[in-house]
UniProtKB/Swiss-Prot annotation:
GO terms for molecular function: NADH dehydrogenase (ubiquinone) activity; quinone binding. This is NAD(P)H-quinone oxidoreductase subunit 6, chloroplastic. Signal peptide: none annotated. Its EC number is 7.1.1.-. Keywords: Chloroplast, Membrane, NAD, NADP, Plastid, Plastoquinone, Quinone, Thylakoid, Translocase, Transmembrane, Transmembrane helix, Transport.
Amino acid sequence: MDLPGPIHDFLVVLLGSGLILGSMGVLLFNNSIYSAFSLGLVLVSISLFYILANAQFVAAAQLLIYVGAINVLIIFAVMFMKGSEYSKDFNLWTVGNGVTFLVCTSIFVSLMTTIVDTSWYGIIWTTRSNQILEQDLISNSQQIGIYLSTYFFLPFELISIILLAALIGAIAVARQ
């Protein structure tokens, strides 16, 4: 979106805070339904970030696929499960949680130091004239299709396998 600087910055901060609050809700809520709704907030915030970045097709795909299908599937799977058997013997902090926290913190710190230490001067930033020229030559959907079938073929196939495994797992849980 072509917004003035202060409005754009305000929206980025607002969406970022929604993203952080939603992800904290996913981690901290004891009720699985509330965690699933917080995940929906995170996915909607990511979709709105795509809209701010002028990627409306990716935003629509994010909303339809992740919020509309995957998150609803997670909510149905959580509703089919018995919640009482998972709330028994709930320890607030275990050794596995500590190890997971340390691993996630170290990955976060290494990513932040890598981002800060990387010189971003070699990256070519697109200008408005380049975007208009590219839109005249090829449509946005065709460009995404070309990238998915050439440069991002392996990650695209891996994501499809992961989604298939999640769907099979949800069906197996629902059958029990």
